[in-house]
């Protein structure tokens, strides 16, 4: 591709590269970094002005030396060179880069010769952790090879500051918002805690581009970021985290901006969304013209074929005939392998490499099989199927995933949870595990077991939501001190609360102590952010022609003369701009859009987008810290719907809590039987230290 003209900003867009995914696998271990290298070579060969990466560059927040080496090598080969970077930075980068020393863009550093700058945000996989709250993107920023922007310092008070660029007559405002837990971000937007700083707007002078990394669709009422929460001055939103590639712009008619969902560059789960063709995108922006987007297919993607069948739909199969079922499934897999190999040959022939490859790359194959009992008979017997691992091992050496070619699952039946299960209602029986296993599509995660166990237990001290998240950090992100730190923090908080309760200090009754502890636990689980009293925002032009921001009858001026703040209104979820009539600018000019129109219906009450307290309810606030499974990180994925359904059931079960009783009620209840437990003994000893 030729060089862009002096007034065109050319951007390569990518997201969810997941370098390091499954890197110990002898067949697919190098797929992620090879594709990332291809992406960056496309940026170099197409003479782009910058690369924008919308999260999850690495698959884990502690990447291996191999993954880190491959990324550093690729960035050095593709981003450094003699070609000058023609972008002029107009804003103060120290407001965006939250570092002590490296507060400038890397291409303006005299110690580096950067030809293609990379701007990236952190995702949910490579997020910050540890005492210093550092993530892999911080390390790359310190090396000078990446510009890490969009960091979130406080999740309940977020200020989104753009980087302002100019090339010729074209001006670009680049916004970034790193990954925040979806429920928490939903609550922050709802409470008016998100502030956008916007450049001076004149007749569409600025092209406003934003990168986010959140759920795009609702797994629960609050576990996603609605497009309606984003301000309407944006022109385009790059949506990371979702792995399905949608190779066209989708227009939001309510907010009047376009949404691009690039998808992942490597298949991290064997599901339908990952089976779609994968692209990177080149965006050309020129002042006065509609943006031009060009999708470029990725060539290093391993061929992936997926098929779903139901044994009920095969008339000649009988539930008890295991051999006939296995024979039929083998035929289906053989057909999928033939189709995948033909597609790989065609791809190599188009690239001119058909005769140079000694062996075809092995494809990824996934056959999902519903083995539920036939619905047209009274027999409750399910189809007899072979062990999935043994069945899959037939194809070792011919497919890339020789251990999980087939996935057996049953249709979900209505779930009725018993209050008592096993001993004291806190244990999970083999039948419970089997039910969870079948509901999750044959692949069970530790997170699902922990969530189900906590729903059946009646913890009197630790909040289940926080404990669930601590276990996830311990298992998924190898944070060995996550559980210890969480328990120590919660005990310290609750002991501090109880030490100020005079009635608790006076009583020695164990039952009364337990009742008071439950109240403290409920209060500790729900920490709502108080809504701001006045979020109304007004804009006016001052004497210098620059915007100023007024909120709550106070005038607040920003530090940069080119940027003005914009608050997200707590009532309507949009940015209100009311300007003086004497200098009222015209609205954003209508661009000729080539985007696919998608009619977005008005959100009903069931989606809980409105900020009315009676619609959201206390239960949603109480469960704002529920962590939703990231289906895109599963080595062999289940359906997102299956995973979210199990968590949603847990959520509904958990929200049925009794209202907090008063201390007087607790006192009367404590006059009955009395029994001491190790938990109350521990609290008693801690409180004794407090008394001293």
UniProtKB/Swiss-Prot annotation:
It holds the Pfam family Mre11_DNA_bind. InterPro entries: Calcineurin-like_PHP_ApaH, Metallo-depent_PP-like, Mre11, Mre11_capping_dom, Mre11_DNA-bd, Mre11_N. Keywords: Chromosome, DNA damage, DNA repair, Endonuclease, Exonuclease, Hydrolase, Manganese, Meiosis, Metal-binding, Nuclease, Nucleus, Telomere. It comes from the Eukaryota. Changing residue 659 to S: In strain: SK1. Mn(2+) 2 binds at residues 56, 124, 213, 241. Disulfide bonds: none annotated. Residues 575-586 have a biased composition (Polar residues). Its EC number is 3.1.-.-. It is found in: Nucleus; Chromosome, Telomere; Chromosome. Changing residue 76 to K: Does not affect ability to mediate DNA repair. GO terms for biological process: ascospore formation; base-excision repair; DNA double-strand break processing; DNA double-strand break processing involved in repair via synthesis-dependent strand annealing; DNA repair; double-strand break repair; double-strand break repair via break-induced replication; double-strand break repair via homologous recombination. Residues 587-597, 666-676 have a biased composition (Basic residues). Present with 432 molecules/cell in log phase SD medium. PANTHER family: DOUBLE-STRAND BREAK REPAIR PROTEIN MRE11 (PTHR10139:SF1). This is Double-strand break repair protein MRE11. It comes from Saccharomyces cerevisiae (strain ATCC 204508 / S288c) (Baker's yeast).
């Amino acid at each position: 591709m030729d060089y862009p003209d002096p007034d065109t900003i050319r951007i390569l867009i990518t997201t969810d590269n997941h370098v390091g995914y499954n890197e110990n696998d002898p067949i697919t271990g190098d797929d992620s970094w090879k594709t990332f290298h291809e992406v960056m070579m496309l940026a170099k060969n197409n003479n782009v002005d910058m690369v924008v990466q919308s999260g999850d560059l690495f698959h884990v927040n502690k990447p291996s030396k191999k993954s880190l080496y491959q990324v550093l090598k690729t960035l050095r080969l593709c981003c450094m060179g003699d070609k000058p970077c023609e972008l002029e930075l107009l804003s103060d980068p120290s407001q965006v880069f939250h570092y002590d020393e490296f507060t400038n863009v890397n291409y303006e550093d005299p110690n580096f010769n950067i030809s293609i700058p990379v701007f990236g945000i952190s995702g949910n996989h490579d997020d910050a952790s540890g005492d210093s709250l550092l993530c892999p993107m911080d390390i790359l920023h310190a090396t000078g090879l990446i510009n890490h922007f969009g960091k979130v310092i406080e999740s309940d008070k977020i200020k989104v500051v753009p980087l302002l660029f100019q090339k010729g007559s074209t001006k670009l405002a680049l916004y970034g918002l790193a990954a925040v837990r979806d429920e928490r971000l939903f609550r922050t937007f709802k409470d008016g805690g998100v502030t956008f700083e916007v450049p001076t707007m004149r007749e569409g002078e600025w092209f406003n581009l934003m990168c986010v990394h959140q759920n795009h669709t609702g797994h629960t009422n609050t576990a996603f970021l609605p497009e309606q929460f984003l301000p309407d001055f944006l022109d385009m939103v790059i949506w990371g985290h979702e792995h399905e590639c949608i190779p066209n712009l989708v227009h939001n008619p309510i907010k009047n901006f376009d949404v691009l969902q690039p998808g992942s560059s490597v298949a991290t789960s064997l599901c339908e969304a990952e089976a779609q063709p994968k692209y990177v995108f080149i965006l050309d922006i020129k002042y006065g013209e509609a943006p031009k987007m060009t999708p470029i297919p990725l060539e290093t993607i391993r061929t992936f074929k997926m098929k779903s069948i139901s044994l009920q739909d095969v008339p000649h199969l009988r539930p008890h005939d295991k051999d006939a079922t296995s024979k039929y499934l083998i035929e289906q897999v053989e057909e999928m392998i033939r189709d995948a190999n033909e597609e790989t040959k065609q791809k190599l022939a188009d690239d001119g490499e058909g005769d140079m490859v000694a062996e075809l790359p092995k494809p990824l194959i996934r056959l999902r099989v519903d083995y539920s009992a036939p619905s047209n008979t009274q027999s409750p017997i399910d189809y007899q199927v072979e062990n999935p691992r043994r069945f899959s091992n037939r194809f070792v050496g011919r497919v890339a995933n020789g251990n999980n070619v087939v996935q057996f699952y049953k249709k979900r039946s209505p779930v009725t949870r018993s209050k008592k299960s096993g001993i004291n209602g806190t244990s999970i029986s083999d039948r419970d595990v089997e039910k969870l296993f079948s509901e999750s599509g044959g692949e069970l995660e530790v997170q699902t077991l922990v969530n189900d166990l906590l729903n059946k237990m009646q913890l009197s001290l630790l909040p289940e939501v926080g404990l669930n998240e601590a276990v996830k950090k311990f298992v998924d992100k190898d944070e060995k001190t996550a559980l210890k730190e969480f328990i120590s923090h919660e005990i310290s908080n609750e002991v501090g609360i109880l030490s100020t309760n005079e009635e608790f200090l006076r009583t020695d009754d164990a039952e009364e102590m337990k009742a008071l502890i439950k109240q403290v636990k409920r209060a500790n689980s729900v920490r709502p952010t108080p809504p701001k009293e006045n979020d109304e925002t007004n804009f006016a032009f001052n004497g210098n022609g620059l915007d100023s921001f007024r909120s709550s009858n106070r005038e607040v001026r920003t530090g940069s003369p080119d940027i003005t703040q914009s608050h997200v209104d707590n009532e309507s979820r949009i940015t209100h701009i009311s300007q003086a009539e004497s200098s009222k600018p015209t609205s954003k000019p209508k661009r000729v859009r080539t985007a696919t129109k998608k009619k977005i219906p008005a959100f009903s009450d069931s989606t809980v987008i409105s900020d009315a307290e009676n619609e959201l309810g206390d239960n949603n606030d109480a469960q704002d810290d529920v962590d939703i499974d990231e289906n895109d990180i599963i080595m062999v994925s289940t359906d997102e719907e299956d995973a979210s359904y199990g968590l949603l059931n847990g959520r509904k079960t958990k929200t049925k809590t009794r209202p907090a009783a008063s201390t007087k009620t607790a006192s009367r209840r404590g006059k009955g039987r009395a029994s001491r437990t190790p938990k109350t003994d521990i609290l008693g000893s801690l409180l004794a230290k407090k008394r001293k």
